[in-house]
């Protein structure tokens, strides 16, 4: 049986980390694509040379032509300019929109059967544009946001309670940005919801609110600390978890930016919601009931994404023709 082929579009920090993780987890052969000559080839060779030490068998190829991604089962897209300090996600819009159009055309031509995971920011708008440009079925194109945001929330909670991260589940909905919605009542430690832990005296509501805020600003906190660049270890690990659920038909329930067509009262937009990922892609959208403040926060988040999508339509009206 031939190994699966995994294509990585963009060979920056996330791209390199993705390639390394694919090797370590033996998920398949890797093609790293980038417009910069030498970078994907150099990183591929470097990672390939670590394989005898770590004991994984995989072929790593660097390429500057989309032809190399032909037949990929999974395509993970990180191409685009990164966010710099002081730059809003929206500033990235027009630059990265053009990149998505080019990437989408490459996927359409060479990997039309792939499961596509977008990581490029501003995430919810970019995954929408990528689906339009590629013409792939909505269930086969998703955005990586919620897994990362939930991981940050889980890490902060585990740290606060001094318990294993494995015993903390957390739920983050909405757009990938300052308006994301970490749902406290659906987040648990060993199955005990956070509001109950407040009653048990494990923490206070005020402290939980601080952790929610820190989660919202998780990406910006790292950007400000690094000064040059943004997070790449946790985003890469998050995308790999999604890819693995697809490749192995694990049917994991994970929050991703998924296409909504009526669910949660949202139409023709990608928004972060819990879904089941199996070998058909997004196999089910989990529609939980939202009320009160949670519903308000979710609607606000959706409105922020809607604003970005409308801006995309103005910048690139040709996407609507796809």
UniProtKB/Swiss-Prot annotation:
Q: Which domain of life is it from?
A: Bacteria
Identify the catalytic residues: 176 (proton acceptor)
Task: State its Enzyme Commission number(s).
Answer: 1.1.1.37
> Binding positions for substrate?
83, 89, 121, 152
**PANTHER family from the xrefs?**
L-2-HYDROXYCARBOXYLATE DEHYDROGENASE (NAD(P)(+)), L-LACTATE DEHYDROGENASE
Give the protein's biological function: Catalyzes the reversible oxidation of malate to oxaloacetate.
Name of the protein described by the UniProt record? Malate dehydrogenase 1
Natural source organism: Rhodopseudomonas palustris (strain BisB18)
Taxonomically, what lineage is the organism?
Bacteria, Pseudomonadati, Pseudomonadota, Alphaproteobacteria, Hyphomicrobiales
Q: Which gene encodes it?
A: mdh1
């Amino acid at each position: 049986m031939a190994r699966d082929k995994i294509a990585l579009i963009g060979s920056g920090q996330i791209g390199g980390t993705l390639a390394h993780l694919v090797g370590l987890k033996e998920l398949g052969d890797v093609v790293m694509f980038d417009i910069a000559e030498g970078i994907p080839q150099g990183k591929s060779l470097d990672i390939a040379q670590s394989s005898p030490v770590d004991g994984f068998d995989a072929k790593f190829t660097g390429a500057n032509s989309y032809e190399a991604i032909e037949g990929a089962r999974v395509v993970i897209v990180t191409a685009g300019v990164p966010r710099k300090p002081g730059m809003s996600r929206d500033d990235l819009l027009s630059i990265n929109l053009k990149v998505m159009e080019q990437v989408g055309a490459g996927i359409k031509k060479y990997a039309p059967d792939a499961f596509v995971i977008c990581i490029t920011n501003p995430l919810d708008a970019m995954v929408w544009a990528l689906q339009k440009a590629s013409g792939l079925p909505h269930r086969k194109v998703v955005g990586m946001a919620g897994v990362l945001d939930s991981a940050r929330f889980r890490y902060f909670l585990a740290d606060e309670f001094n318990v294993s991260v494995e015993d903390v589940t957390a739920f983050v909905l909405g757009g990938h940005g300052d308006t994301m919605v970490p749902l406290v009542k659906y987040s648990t430690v060993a199955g005990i919801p956070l509001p109950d832990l407040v009653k048990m005296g494990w923490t206070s509501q005020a402290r939980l609110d601080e952790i929610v805020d820190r989660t919202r600003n998780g990406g910006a906190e790292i950007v400000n600390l690094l000064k040059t660049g943004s997070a790449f270890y946790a985003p890469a690990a998050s995308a790999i978890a999604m890819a693995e659920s697809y490749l192995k038909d694990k049917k994991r329930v994970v929050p991703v930016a998924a296409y909504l067509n009526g669910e949660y009262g949202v139409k023709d937009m990608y928004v972060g919601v819990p879904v089941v990922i199996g070998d058909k892609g997004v196999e089910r959208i989990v529609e939980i009931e939202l009320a009160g403040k949670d519903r308000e926060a979710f609607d606000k988040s959706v409105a922020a994404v809607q604003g970005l999508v409308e801006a995309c339509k103005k910048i690139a009206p040709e996407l609507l023709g796809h």
